[in-house]
Amino acid sequence: VLSAADKSNVKACWGKIGSHAGEYGAEALERTFCSFPTTKTYFPHFDLSHGSAQVKAHGQKVADALTQAVAHMDDLPTAMSALSDLHAYKLRVDPVNFKFLSHCLLVTLACHHPAEFTPAVHASLDKFFSAVSTVLTSKYR
């Protein structure tokens, strides 16, 4: 459960990301593909090379979904319902991949915002990404 402090930390951090959200989403995807090669199996139709337009576009989708989640932290299940359905029923993404992407998002944010990435912010973002992952995998059961 996200505390009031966690929500405040996440909103403040996400606010600083601003127009870079799509760029960071793409970078996190690239990190995920490099660090966890099995994740590539869900994107056989993508050009997965560095700077690929397809990876950038999907990175923007990830960022947009997270921006929506930040805006609706008090009701993630409703806000993420359609995305949960998509990943569970159509794409059938292995739930562990959300953890991999979450880790790579944390690394990406820490690289770009080291001064703001305090232990408290790190913990809050980790809890937030975990909450989003839990919602995205809730329909698997």
From Swiss-Prot:
InterPro entries: Globin, Globin-like_sf, Globin/Proto, Hemoglobin_a-typ, Hemoglobin_oxygen_transport, Hemoglobin_pi
Any single GO BP term: cellular oxidant detoxification
Database matches in Pfam families: Globin
Tissues expressed in: Red blood cells.
Molecular function as annotated in GO: heme binding; iron ion binding; oxygen binding; oxygen carrier activity
Modified residues (N6-acetyllysine): 16
Amino acids binding heme b: 87
Residues with Phosphothreonine modification: 108, 134, 137
Positions contributing to O2 binding: 58
Keyword annotations from UniProtKB, A to Z: Acetylation, Heme, Iron, Metal-binding, Oxygen transport, Phosphoprotein, Transport
PTM-bearing positions, type Phosphotyrosine: 24
SUPFAM superfamilies, per the entry: Globin-like (SSF46458)
Highest taxon in the source lineage: Eukaryota
GO cellular component, one term: haptoglobin-hemoglobin complex
Modified residue annotations for Phosphoserine: 3, 35, 49, 102, 124, 138
Span of domain Globin: 1-141
Modified residue annotations for N6-succinyllysine: 7, 11, 16, 40
Record function comment: Involved in oxygen transport from the lung to the various peripheral tissues.
Oligomer status and interactors: Heterotetramer of two alpha chains and two beta chains.
Assigned protein family: Belongs to the globin family.
Protein name (Swiss-Prot/TrEMBL): Hemoglobin subunit alpha
Organism: Felis catus
This protein's encoding gene: HBA
